[in-house]
Design a protein with these regions (language model features):
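Glycine-rich phosphate-binding loop plus the immediately following alpha-helix
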Residues: 141-143, 147-172
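Conserved beta-strand-loop-short alpha-helix elements that form
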Residues: 2, 131-141
Length: 282
């Protein structure tokens, strides 16, 4: 199947350290070589800053504008070649795009051909915000009735599930719901889809990161006091204390632990966890 990587933070942070190890699994240290993708939510004032992997610098900006536009911008990269060899993936490994919510995916095709339109993460608009979704699993006999504007472009079970999730969210809420209200609805939708097969997924609208576990999904919270971390898939390590301050908090979610010396917490099958500002809130 596939592998997932997500990041949720309380301040814009780059994911170059984590993505470097993750991308090696896309055809080098593992066999997920059928495409990859990554999406970064950004506020109006964010951009690319000079820095080291997973640094946490924030540009000066107007607070009112930031609150209004926080996380509404999106940078989205996909490629149907392997992440371990893709020049675009190499760009992401070296380009410190800062974001509070990131979703990445490396694909091992089970349904749908190897093609650009079948690469995760997928993107849709709802309530004036972008929504990003990536899935690891294999859904069988899942054929929901779709209507309205949410329809898949490619031929994967994953994008079909995403279209259904978006449709049901729109049907369930007359106005723009809160993160807590969305979490309740998403638990109901996930419980409806999960009987069709493994349904590990990451979902974000730029305000929160939702992670649903079916088989394998882990998370780690990085906060003060920060320590060293060493990647499993590359001979790379970092001292986070050199690139952070005491208020920074970062949650990383992944299919299999990326580092060998951090405490990765396994999520329970059927569990939907929501992260806001780098910590679990529900």
């Amino acid at each position: 199947m596939c592998q997932l990587l997500g990041m949720n933070c309380n301040t814009p942070t780059d994911i170059t350290f984590s993505f470097s190890g993750f991308a090696q699994r896309g055809g080098n240290t593992d066999h997920h070589g059928d495409g990859w993708g990554v999406a970064f939510f950004e506020s109006r004032s964010q951009g690319v800053a000079d820095g080291q992997p997973d640094t946490t610098q924030v540009a000066a900006h107007d607070a009112a504008q930031d609150a209004q536009h926080d996380g509404k911008g999106l940078r989205h990269f996909v490629d149907h070649t392997s992440a371990a060899t893709s020049p675009v993936a190499e760009l992401i490994r070296r380009y410190p795009i800062k974001s509070k919510n990131v979703i990445a995916h490396i694909r091992k095709a089970t349904q749908g051909v190897v093609a650009l339109e079948n690469c995760h993460p997928f993107v849709r608009e709802l309530w004036g915000r972008y929504w990003v979704f990536a899935h690891n699993g294999d859904l069988k006999n899942f054929a929901p009735r779709l209507h309205g504007s949410f329809r898949p472009v490619g031929s994967t079970d994953s994008e079909l599930a995403f279209a259904y999730i978006m449709q049901e969210l729109a049907k369930s809420h007359a106005g723009v719901p809160s993160v807590a209200e969305l979490t309740i609805t998403l638990r109901e939708i996930a419980a409806h889809i999960a009987p069709h097969g493994p349904f590990n997924f990451l979902l974000s609208n730029g305000q929160a990161l939702w992670a649903h576990a079916s088989t394998h999904l882990y998370y780690v919270t990085r906060q003060h006091p920060f320590a060293h971390a060493a990647l499993v898939d590359e001979d790379v390590n970092i001292n986070f204390a050199e690139h952070t301050n005491v208020l920074d908090r970062v949650a990383v979610v992944v299919t299999a632990p990326l580092t060998s010396n951090e405490l990765w917490i396994p999520m329970l099958p059927g569990e939907l966890t929501v992260f806001v500002d780098g910590q679990v809130v529900g």
